[in-house]
Amino acid sequence: MNQGQGDGQAQGQGGPATVAPRVRMITVRALLVIAAALVALLLGARHGWAFVLGIALFVLGILISVILHEAGHFLTAKSFGMKATQFFVGFGPTLWSTVRGETEYGVKALPFGAFVRITGMTTLDEVDPADEPRSMRNKPAWQRAIVMVAGSFMHFALAFVLLLILAIGIGQANDNTTTIGSVSPCVPASLKAFDQGSCTHSQGAAPAKAAGIKPGDKIIAIDGKPVHNWVQLGTAIRAQPAGQPMAVTVERDGQELTLHAVPATVPGRNGSYLGIGDAVIFTRSNPIAAVAFAGSAFGQVLTGSAEAVAKLPAALPDLFARDRAKTPAANVSSMVGAADIAGQAVASSGGWRYTVSDLLLILISINIFLGAVNLLPLLPMDGGHLAVIFYERIRAWLARLRGKPDPGLVDLQKLIPVSVGVFALLIGLGVLLMAADIFNPVHLVQ
């Protein structure tokens, strides 16, 4: 590093040793900007700029979530005197970095996450003898456990705060209704037109409009089968074969009417299309009620996520089925699918409350899901390291009972095959979900 005054002056004047890295970094930044611009142009041309904005907001939200996750590890490690040498956002080539104290902070080229480097996090890490007393592996088990849990805690805390913001600032959406809030004037001619709500070059009047369905109507049955909420209604519509008339029983001004609609299809979209939107009423909560709502909603999302993941193996064939939306477990999405839904939410014409509510709910669900999955006792996730810590303590306790010395830390070298297997399984599942989200996406509206 220290190459003398002469070299320092030459490099300061733009010598080859300095110019080459700068040129490479400028090239990397330029390529990233060009790539991002091309992706935005392609998405904008196909789905509209509102859709692109939704994806951008989603990516920003996820990036903030991941940064907070790593900040949880970083702050708890520092509070216990552990040495943290790096805190970076992104992966790949470094775009910018600065050193503050003993830690290097920076941004890398690929914004797909973040990482913290804590000295001696595992027995596999090489540590300078001078830093060994401050290494994570030399700290008490309870401190190491707190550091490992801190990442998921940040996900849960962020989700809870977003739920409070949703309840107090936006309001709770009462979508447990079948009342019509809007009727589309047309059948969109393409998936792009569908996402934008555009009627340019349409395929004619929407089935709901042609049948005489009006905003304010409450749909109570489809083909004589009662529907009690919007989910049931959407499932019934999507299951109806396009072109086949169906009886829609509505309640209007206290009277029941039976109207007949012929569902249509939108090119590139799965399921039949009726052209209706629900009437959602948003009710704001006071702070006390908001806390109760946040706790209840948190538990519901956590339980729902666990059930969906448990049922996912059996639902894998339904990922590519035409009626994917009918199987809740098959609605589990990759980040690609979640970004697509965020884009749809912003591109929809349901109003700003609906848009913000949908975006917040997406981020809330993902943070709760990530926080829970990350605590599963499987390496290389945080829960796997936590399980190893518990195993070490149980093993040490049993050794004391037998009058033997503490066996010490677990040799993680022996667990590498397990980590590789779990990692490969997660990658495979992620690729499968991503393929389903690309070729058989989930849509928000009916």
Residue ranges and their predicted role:
Residues 33-81, 333-365, 437, 446:
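Long, highly hydrophobic alpha-helical transmembrane signal-anchor segments
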Residues 67-68, 79, 112-190, 417-421:
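Internal alpha-helical transmembrane segments
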Residues 214, 220-222, 234-277:
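PDZ-domain C-terminal substructure recognizer with occasional recognition of PDZ-binding tails
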Residues 197-200, 205-231:
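Conserved PDZ fold ligand-binding element
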Residues 2-48, 52:
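Topogenic membrane-insertion module of multi-pass membrane proteins
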